[in-house]
Amino acid sequence: MQAGLRIDVDTYRGTREGVPRLLESLDEAGVKATFFFSVGPDNMGRHLWRLIRPQFLWKMLRSNAAGLYGWDILLAGTAWPGKPIGRDLGHLMRQTLAAGHEVGLHAWDHHGWQANTGRWSQAQLIEQIRRGVDSLNDILGQAVSCSASAGWRADERVIEAKQQFGFRYNSDCRGQSLFLPRLADGSLGAPQIPVDLPTFDEVVGPVVAAKDFNSYILDRFSPDKLNVYTVHAEVEGILMANDFRQLLASARQRDIHFQPLGNMLPADLASLPAGKVVRGALEGREGWLGVQGA
């Protein structure tokens, strides 16, 4: 059974500590994945202001966020400028590419993207993407060929903004199948590879206990589904690193074969159906996010 493995790297600590452990676990399992890196300032601690929203507060409490992520992640960029991830830790991004993994852009400023996507102008959206692309291009020494919107914060405006960067594909939304998003002028944009499986933080607590998560998620892979799974360097690369190593071993026993997302594209892109990315909601995730629409 084929499956896509996507690894989101949101923070400075996730890059510095989580990525090396994930690379080690993946090498041990003989698995290649797609890493989406945040490359600008780590301002993730500014999400603490969202605690005034009941849904976000409940998510932080049920997932034991302080224990899961660590206070350095939860406070990053609050009382001091966020550390520059790409400038300080670009060598780990190059190491990821050299290890044979696919590398794409997650965001310039992960917090900024999640907090402001819905109100930024088209010019501001394009500038944020450009800063991230230029930075990651310089770090890798080659052009970035794919991207994934931070927090799945994407809609039709975001899809339009990304089109000018010539990405081979994007993974900006939640959905059930690969598709070509329809643009404002009626043409079709770069392929979308949605995520169709829940993440650890979306279900642990209200749905399943952390100790039972591996079995829970592996039971949801199916030959007749897309099977795109997302892990986070801040979770599966740090506190849950051993559990992720066990998940990779269990997946192999179940004949689940992970691969980079780019490998899931068909040879003939014209064979993909048309669709669109629209705003929607998802149980376990606070606020709006991009979902696959008809």
From Swiss-Prot:
* UniProt GO MF annotations: hydrolase activity, acting on carbon-nitrogen (but not peptide) bonds, in linear amides
Boundaries of every NodB homology domain copy: 1-259
Q: Which GO biological process entries does UniProt record here?
A: 4-amino-4-deoxy-alpha-L-arabinopyranosyl undecaprenyl phosphate biosynthetic process; lipid A biosynthetic process; lipopolysaccharide biosynthetic process; response to antibiotic
- Catalytic activity field: 4-deoxy-4-formamido-alpha-L-arabinopyranosyl di-trans,octa-cis-undecaprenyl phosphate + H2O = 4-amino-4-deoxy-alpha-L-arabinopyranosyl di-trans,octa-cis-undecaprenyl phosphate + formate
Sorted UniProt keywords: Antibiotic resistance, Hydrolase, Lipid A biosynthesis, Lipid biosynthesis, Lipid metabolism, Lipopolysaccharide biosynthesis
Listed GO cellular component terms? membrane
Pfam families xrefs: Polysacc_deac_1
Task: Please name the InterPro entries in this protein's record.
Answer: ArnD (IPR023557), Glyco_hydro/deAcase_b/a-brl (IPR011330), NODB_dom (IPR002509), Polysacc_deacetylase_ArnD (IPR050248)
Q: Under which pathway is this protein filed?
A: Glycolipid biosynthesis; 4-amino-4-deoxy-alpha-L-arabinose undecaprenyl phosphate biosynthesis; 4-amino-4-deoxy-alpha-L-arabinose undecaprenyl phosphate from UDP-4-deoxy-4-formamido-beta-L-arabinose and undecaprenyl phosphate: step 2/2; Bacterial outer membrane biogenesis; lipopolysaccharide biosynthesis
Q: What is its EC number?
A: 3.5.1.n3
What is known about what this protein does?
Catalyzes the deformylation of 4-deoxy-4-formamido-L-arabinose-phosphoundecaprenol to 4-amino-4-deoxy-L-arabinose-phosphoundecaprenol. The modified arabinose is attached to lipid A and is required for resistance to polymyxin and cationic antimicrobial peptides.
Give the UniProt family note.
Answer: Belongs to the polysaccharide deacetylase family. ArnD deformylase subfamily.
This chain belongs to the protein called Probable 4-deoxy-4-formamido-L-arabinose-phosphoundecaprenol deformylase ArnD
